[in-house]
Amino acid sequence: MSLIKRIPSKNDTDSNDRLIPFINGEYRCANNDSMINLIEKLIIKKNSFSFDTETSSLSPFEADLVGISISTEKETGWYIPINHSSGNNISESNLTKIKQLFENEEIKKFAHNANYDISVLVNNDFKINNLNFDTLIAANLLNKRSLSLKNLCLEILRLQMTSIEELIGKGKDQISFKDVDIEKAVNYACADADATFRLKEIFEDELSKIGLQDVMNKIEIPLIPVIVEMQKSGVSINSQILNKISLELKNEISDLELRAKNIIGNEEVNLRSSQQLSDILINQMNI
């Protein structure tokens, strides 16, 4: 889900470094057989693509998947409408082709905040194989000032992206992304996938230079599907052992409270009261 842009402050730029609107490259809507076949050929040829999802909610397992944007190279993007309330959405047969591309183990995939996007896709019967890079995680490893895709574009690419509010509004007048016209969604959604592709190339090089590429490849990326599954299915617990631990901790806390009250010399004191503790420690015990 795309995040709202940050308004540039004086510290973000200066008079000699002018921000420009995000370049609308070759951004297209892919909602027919010929377009989907073209995407399929391009992805197989490039053997990699960046992707982003457009949804109806920030909660991935409650969100409707409205569309997917894909980029196979800089300044390109394809928006695949899936569940807009009006307009021509992709057919089920073509959606199956897109799912097969995500499932293909030979094709590398890149995303920004893959945890969210993969959670949404998995909840819509996608299977994601060979996730290769996450620009949000890379930004964190590189100690970037912001982790937001739009802020990173502002900071690194000097490109200002469209705010989600420009499409869906805000407050009581806010609409769902499902109700955004497909034509208006294309440039917005494709810019996210395009930006992810551009940042991936930059961050991958930076991680390699400081020796953190293995951290991304061997630790961070393999953890994402594990975390997604945990968020979706939960984690099994042994309730008997947890109840036993809970009882042990409760008894230990009671013993500590009794010892503290004996030291204070007042069995009626409420140790959970910050006011009483403050009076005892500062005024009575001069600590």
Language model features with spans:
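Conserved "right-hand" nucleotidyltransferase catalytic core of DNA-directed polymerases
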Residues: 1-85, 144, 152, 164, ...
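Nucleic-acid-processing active sites and adjacent nucleic-acid-binding tracks
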Residues: 33, 73-109
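A structural signal for short coil/turn segments at secondary-structure junctions
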Residues: 43-46, 102-105, 125
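Acidic beta-strand-to-loop metal/phosphate-binding motif
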Residues: 50, 106-114
